[in-house]
């Protein structure tokens, strides 16, 4: 994600929260010029540490989202802060998205689920993936409320109208002033909504889609590569949703190449670095739901690729 911003954006600075010591060590060794690396020991406060034992690793990461934004705004006195998921990849400068919010204080990004796959009721209207808060009265009021709410309850389950850190955002357009919902379709492309759009072409870093509903073209700003997972024997799983082969070949394959380049870069500065991959087997898929998904993928042979074959077929991209 950092490298994609380097290619597409002249002016940015990332505040990267390293959630384990090894990540912090490697990120500091990389000497990223436009990034500040923040360790857990510097970031965690008493409230976060108090609830940490009651959350899984994933739930704790979700719990911390609002706190990371608040930390950056207060610690570094920045005028605004945009939270980014680490599995985003940018194809053009996100300034076009930030400009859209105008004088508003908060920018939200919808999931944009298609009707046949609408999980709004359980997962939320908005996706915590690209989320901006301005350091003003309206922005900080919402941010502090969100942090307190996530510390009180943030779990990987639907309960009483809540789910993780996301469902809390559902009523913000009426709860708070200065909230803008992103309209640019190029911001928020992901496996759960890309089937609504037809891939048209990719020229370098310029990716063009066609929106069937509005009968119009738009350029991708970023894509959310949710649930891309690597396994032993050069296997990559692209997730549960089923993107078309043009999307796989023009977005996923180049993304896999970029991840492998970054792995090699890390190995250059840390000879002992090794990713402990699992076998792509039924036993390594936790829970009944994931086991069923695994069986479907094996039987119907979709979304699971050999990385070498995938890259070889798209070496000219």
Predicted regions and their residues:
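Glycosyltransferase catalytic domains, chiefly GT-A lineage
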Residues: 1-317
């Amino acid at each position: 994600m950092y490298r994609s911003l380097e290619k597409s954006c002249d002016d940015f600075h990332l505040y990267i929260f390293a959630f384990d010591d090894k990540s912090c060590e490697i990120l500091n060794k990389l000497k990223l010029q436009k990034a500040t690396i923040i360790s857990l020991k510097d970031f965690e406060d008493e409230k976060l540490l108090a609830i940490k034992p009651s959350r899984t690793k994933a739930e704790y990461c979700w719990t911390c989202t609002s706190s990371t934004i608040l930390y950056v705004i207060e610690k570094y006195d920045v005028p605004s802060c945009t939270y980014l998921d680490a599995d985003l990849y940018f194809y053009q400068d996100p300034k076009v998205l930030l400009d859209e919010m105008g004088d508003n204080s908060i920018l939200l990004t919808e999931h944009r689920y298609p009707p046949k796959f609408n999980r709004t009721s359980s997962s939320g209207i908005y996706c915590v993936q690209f989320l901006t808060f301005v350091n003003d009265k309206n922005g900080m009021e919402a941010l502090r409320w969100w942090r307190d709410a996530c510390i009180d309850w943030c779990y990987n389950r639907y309960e009483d109208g809540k789910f993780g850190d996301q469902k809390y955002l559902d009523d913000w357009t009426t709860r708070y002033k200065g909230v803008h919902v992103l309209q640019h379709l190029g911001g928020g492309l992901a496996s759960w909504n890309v089937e609504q759009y037809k891939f048209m072409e990719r020229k370098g870093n310029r990716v063009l889609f066609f929106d069937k509903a509005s009968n119009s073209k738009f350029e991708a700003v970023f894509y959310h590569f949710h649930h891309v997972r690597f396994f032993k024997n050069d296997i990559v799983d692209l997730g549960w949703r089923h993107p078309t082969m043009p999307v796989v070949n023009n977005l996923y394959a180049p993304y896999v190449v970029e991840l492998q380049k970054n792995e090699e870069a890390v190995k250059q500065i840390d000879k002992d670095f090794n990713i402990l991959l699992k076998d792509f087997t039924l036993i390594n898929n936790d829970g009944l739901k994931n086991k069923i998904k695994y069986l479907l993928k094996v039987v119907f042979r979709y979304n699971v690729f050999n990385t070498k074959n995938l890259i070889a077929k798209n070496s000219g991209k």
